[in-house]
Design a protein with these regions (language model features):
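A short, structure-level motif marking secondary-structure boundaries and short turns
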Residues: 12-15, 32-34, 82-83
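S-adenosylmethionine/decaboxylated-SAM
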Residues: 42-167
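Short, basic/glycine-rich phosphate-binding loops at helix/coil junctions
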Residues: 25-31
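N-terminal auxiliary segments of SAM/dcSAM-dependent transferases
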Residues: 1-22
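Conserved SAM-binding loop and adjacent beta-strand
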Residues: 17-20, 33-47, 53
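Amphipathic alpha-helical segments within well-ordered protein domains
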Residues: 11-16, 29, 49, 98
Length: 167
């Protein structure tokens, strides 16, 4: 199956540009590219904001912090009382994300940045306590992340697997 059959470049461009990202989300994506960190597309960040808003998400788990672009997009849609728990083994990326959150005046009680192997860390999170789980991590571990997400999500919660069709 050819890529053109799935979505031509004009359609993809239109979809990506239809809803512009807020400046701070765009800046975090640019920081990711500069740092050599995989950066989410505008379409991904817009979809995350939409999902968090529709769910009125108060508790979100993000597996794969990156430079904070996806976290910022989630905060755009989350409840003002919401808490983002973001897990990543790369402390440096988390420091960049933390600064991005602070630059947006997101109070520290609204985010938890946990450094460590995600599959080990999620074992310590509460069952059925989260509205949304975003997995943006090592693709070869997605099967295990899905199993953990099933445990973490409340009834009606949403699992997002970024780049699930990557291969």
């Amino acid at each position: 199956m050819s890529e053109a059959f799935l979505l031509d470049k004009r359609s993809l461009g239109y979809a990506e540009d239809y809803v512009p990202a807020p400046d701070h989300v765009r800046a975090a994506r640019e920081d990711a590219v500069s740092a050599g960190v995989p950066a989410p597309s505008n379409g991904v960040t817009t979809a995350l904001t939409f999902l968090a808003k529709v769910l009125d998400a108060k508790a979100v788990v993000e597996i794969g912090t990156g430079t904070g672009a996806t976290g910022l997009a989630l905060f755009e849609g989350m409840s003002p009382q919401g808490v983002l728990t973001s897990i990543d083994p790369e402390v440096g990326w988390q420091l960049t994300a933390k600064q991005a959150f602070r630059d947006r005046q997101i109070a520290s009680q609204h985010f938890r940045l946990i450094a460590g192997r995600p599959l080990e860390v999620v074992n310590n999170l509460r069952d059925a306590a989260y509205d949304l789980v975003l997995v943006n991590a090592e693709k070869l571990e997605y099967v295990e992340h899905v199993a953990q997400a099933e445990r973490l999500l409340r009834p009606g919660g949403v699992l997002v697997l970024n780049d699930a069709l990557w291969h």
